[in-house]
UniProtKB/Swiss-Prot annotation:
It comes from Nicotiana tabacum (Common tobacco). The gene is ndhJ. This is NAD(P)H-quinone oxidoreductase subunit J, chloroplastic. Its main location: plastid. NDH shuttles electrons from NAD(P)H:plastoquinone, via FMN and iron-sulfur (Fe-S) centers, to quinones in the photosynthetic chain and possibly in a chloroplast respiratory chain. The immediate electron acceptor for the enzyme in this species is believed to be plastoquinone. Couples the redox reaction to proton translocation, and thus conserves the redox energy in a proton gradient. Gene3D superfamilies: NADH:ubiquinone oxidoreductase, 30kDa subunit. Belongs to the complex I 30 kDa subunit family.
Length: 158
C-alpha cells in the first residue's frame, strides 16, 4: 500500500520502496544508500526538519544491517505532526551509508552509536568514532554474529 509521501516521491521521480505503515499508521519507506543523502535534503526542504530518532539493527545473522530514521514535519499545528520512517539497508561486508549530520545535526551521537554497536560507517560524519565502547574494542556488539569475549577479556578492557 502506497502512502501520501510515497506517491509524492513517485510523482517527482525519486526512487524508493514503500514498506507500508507501522502500527501507529506512520508510513515506512526504504531508500537505497546511494540515494539517501539527496532524498534526506529533499525531505528537509519539504518540511521534515526534525529528526526524532535514528537507530540501527541487524536484520538477520549474515544478512543486511539497517539504519532507521524517524522524521517529523510540523506544519499547521503541534498536535498533528506528520511523521515518516526511513529505512536504509547496507551490506554487512561493507556497511556504508551517507551521514545526514549536515542535514539534521541531532543525528550526531545516534549515528556514532550505530557505528559503535553495529559497525555501520556513516560517510562524511565529522566525528565518527566509538561513543560507548573503548576505542580498542574489537568487533560490533549488537551484530547477531558477534562472539562475546570471556569475562577476563572484558575485565582487562577496563
Amino acid at each position: 500500500m502506497q502512502g501520501r509521501l510515497s506517491a509524492w516521491l513517485v510523482k517527482h521521480g525519486l526512487i524508493h520502496r514503500s514498506l507500508g505503515f507501522d502500527y501507529q499508521g506512520i508510513e515506512t519507506l526504504q531508500i537505497k544508500p546511494e540515494d539517501w543523502h539527496s532524498i534526506a535534503v529533499i525531505f528537509y526542504v519539504y518540511g521534515y526538519n526534525y529528526l526524532r530518532s535514528q537507530c540501527a539493527y541487524d536484520v538477520a545473522p549474515g544478512g543486511l544491517l539497517a539504519s532507521v530514521y524517524h522524521l517529523t514535519r510540523i506544519e499547521d499545528g503541534v498536535d498533528q505532526p506528520e511523521e515518516v520512517c526511513i529505512k536504509v539497508f547496507a551490506s554487512r561486508r561493507n556497511p556504508r551509508i551517507p551521514s545526514v549530520f549536515w542535514v539534521w545535526k541531532s543525528v550526531d551521537f545516534q549515528e556514532r552509536e550505530s557505528y559503535d554497536m553495529l559497525g555501520i560507517s556513516y560517510d562524511n560524519h565529522p566525528r565518527l568514532k566509538r561513543i560507548l565502547m573503548p576505542e580498542s574494542w574489537i568487533g560490533w556488539p549488537l551484530r547477531k554474529d558477534y562472539i562475546a569475549p570471556n569475562f577476563y577479556e572484558i575485565q582487562d578492557a577496563h
